[in-house]
């Protein structure tokens, strides 16, 4: 069976669980369960600490896992990113107290930086020629400055609310942009059929989240103009209607552009424009 690691807690956990459920995999019922076997789909799910997933995958104890790109980079393991998963977007930033004179990357020189991601931060500072002390903390790094342990912090920022509440402000360019991703062990062949099935299923969920099915009627004389607005993946489905002057068109379109596309189609001459959500797909 394919061994898959998922976060047991944290901001990536629920979206990861939901994505696997939408892909047809069985999840745990009891929150105390650490391992779930799904023989019908040929997988075992392991619920692990987010910080540890890349380590297990990198050492080959687990075949694939869902984690953050920042966690993968910080792990320093041999685990390989296989595909982005479209959720958990964040940036990794430096932050200093509002009243601090630290406002640029150069100001970090000689300072103390508290972070949970010490390898990521150390490597970034070395790359930019900055010498600073990196202080490892397992969480709640925002308190380190107030307690006098550090001069600034480096941490994951989603909305920035936690930093603002702690009297901190971000500065300098992000160390990196991150999102959830599927990672694989270097021992697992990229062409492994089990991985191929998982990849197709997850990509199908992503497509269903990002696209909708659009149906509309269009005069035959305006079909070319309408297809230019909604070309679809390969080509839209065009069918004749009872009225021989009209065709029906069915096409997948990006969910984020639905209203603009409906307006554009209406201007072209389309009528009866209907949008339907997708539950799953294989492209």
From Swiss-Prot:
Q: Give the primary localization class.
A: cytoplasm
Protein EC: 2.4.2.17
GO terms of biological process kind: L-histidine biosynthetic process
> Per its Swiss-Prot or TrEMBL record, what regulates the activity?
Feedback inhibited by histidine.
Gene3D superfamilies cross-referenced by the UniProt entry: 3.30.70.120, Periplasmic binding protein-like II
Q: Which SUPFAM superfamilies match?
A: GlnB-like, Periplasmic binding protein-like II
The record's subcellular locations are:
Cytoplasm
Q: Which Pfam families match?
A: HisG (PF01634), HisG_C (PF08029)
- Keywords from the UniProt entry: Amino-acid biosynthesis, ATP-binding, Cytoplasm, Glycosyltransferase, Histidine biosynthesis, Magnesium, Metal-binding, Nucleotide-binding, Transferase
Q: Which reaction does it catalyse?
A: 1-(5-phospho-beta-D-ribosyl)-ATP + diphosphate = 5-phospho-alpha-D-ribose 1-diphosphate + ATP
Q: Which PANTHER family match?
A: ATP PHOSPHORIBOSYLTRANSFERASE, ATP PHOSPHORIBOSYLTRANSFERASE ATP-PRTASE
Question: What family classification does the UniProt entry report for this protein?
Answer: Belongs to the ATP phosphoribosyltransferase family. Long subfamily.
Name of this chain's protein: ATP phosphoribosyltransferase
Lineage of the organism: Bacteria, Bacillati, Actinomycetota, Actinomycetes, Bifidobacteriales
